[in-house]
A protein has these predicted regions:
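C-terminal TM-helix exit segments that contain a strictly Trp-centered aromatic cap at the helix terminus
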Residues: 34-42, 91-114
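Hydrophobic alpha-helical transmembrane segments
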Residues: 64-67, 125-150
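Membrane-interfacial helical/loop segments at transmembrane boundaries in membrane proteins
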Residues: 109-129
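Cytosolic juxtamembrane helix at the C-terminal end of the final transmembrane segment
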Residues: 150-171
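Interfacial segments of alpha-helical transmembrane regions
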Residues: 17-29, 79-93
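Cytosolic juxtamembrane helix and N-cap/initiation of the first transmembrane helix
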Residues: 2-32, 158-161
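Canonical alpha-helical transmembrane segments
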Residues: 63-82
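Transmembrane alpha-helix entry/boundary detector in multi-pass membrane proteins
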Residues: 38, 43-66
Length: 172
């Protein structure tokens, strides 16, 4: 095993302190809150459009919260791996939201949101219903996730580096 592998193993085996856990938990909760705000906006859109969100879509949408929930679990258990799960959560969730709403989802499971925001702004026919309208609130609550996730990722990576350097310095 190389020195860097031993250092990484030591790092991953070390519990984070309360202050560090609190710091990255705030960022993780900010990512979750941004995702929740975005999903709340979908409810607002559905009401505005008189669109009934199918039950299976509610269930499938829970997948968005898997990574932030895993991050929260790891943070609460003071695991040093929580730094990177917060980073992963921010990147994956932001990328997925942007892909679905600016381009097209990979699978057609998102109901009316199988159409991107540009098409929805012009109007689309979906299951016999004409749906039109994307406003500034929709755009703001789409972009809130990357706006929160980018600083969350940077802060988590920076804190990880500081924590690891401190650990390795104290261990020598």
């Amino acid at each position: 095993m190389t020195k860097s592998q031993k250092d990484e193993a030591k790092f991953l085996d070390t519990r984070i302190d309360d202050e560090t856990a609190s710091f990255i938990e705030k960022w993780n909760l900010a990512i979750m809150a941004a995702a929740l705000l975005h999903d709340a906006d979908h409810i607002r859109q559905a009401v505005k459009w008189k669109y009934k969100i199918p039950l299976q879509l509610w269930i499938i949408n829970l997948a968005v919260y898997v990574l932030p929930t895993v991050s929260e679990f790891l943070i609460r258990n003071k695991r040093s791996s929580s730094f990177m799960t917060v980073v992963s959560s921010g990147i994956v969730t932001s990328a997925a939201f942007l892909k679905v709403h600016l381009w097209k989802p990979t699978t057609d499971i998102w109901g009316v949101w199988n159409h991107n925001y540009f098409k929805l702004a012009k109007g689309v026919w979906h299951e016999g219903q004409f749906i039109k309208g994307i406003d500034w609130i929709d755009w703001a609550l789409l972009l809130d996730l990357p706006a929160v996730s980018i600083p969350a990722c940077i802060a988590s990576l920076k804190k990880r580096k500081e924590f690891k350097e401190k650990l390795l310095t104290e261990g020598k």
